[in-house]
Amino acid sequence: MMAEAIANSIGRGQLEAFSAGVRPASKIDPLAVELLNHAGLSPPEHPPQHVREFSAPDSPPLDFVFTLSDTAAGEAPPMWPGHPITAHWRCTDPEQFDDDVDRRQALIRTRKELERRLRLFTNLPVRSLDRMSLQSHLEQLGRGQDA
């Protein structure tokens, strides 16, 4: 949900991001909404959907799919329409923290890291890179390295 808000803000109409999960929450986390608003970002209006919503035959083709949780990365990937380039950009799961202070700090770190990665991603010369090079750059970003 945070990545969707950040990508749609940074992309300024050139990106259309969606949130999905293998076990999506039924509602948007109020703390995440608060932190996005504080950062000047518009949170999505709807909670994340299940990944199968984006792998149905009538789903729009996707160019890129980023997994953010180890759970999602460990699942067998669906057949995405459009044969997107995929990369795992591991993020701390704020749900692993019971304490609100720790959860808040994890969400802040996650927002900052996603923003850094997505800014680097949007500055890649996507049109001039072949698929393997682009895949390599996205994997580097997932490891926390500048592409």
PLM region spans:
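Phosphate-binding/catalytic loops
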Residues: A76-A147
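Generic detector of well-ordered secondary structure
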Residues: S9, H38, L68, E115-R116
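Short glycine-rich anion-binding loops that position phosphate/pyrophosphate groups of nucleotides
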Residues: D70-A73
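Redox-cofactor binding/interface segments in oxidoreductases and associated redox assembly factors
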Residues: T67-L68, H88
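Alpha-helix C-terminal capping/helix-to-coil transition sites in glycosyltransferase folds
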Residues: P60-P61
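Short, flexible, glycine/charge-rich loop motifs used to bind or transfer phosphoryl groups or to couple energy/partner
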Residues: R52-P57, E75-P77
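Conserved active-site segments centered on acidic
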Residues: M1-S55
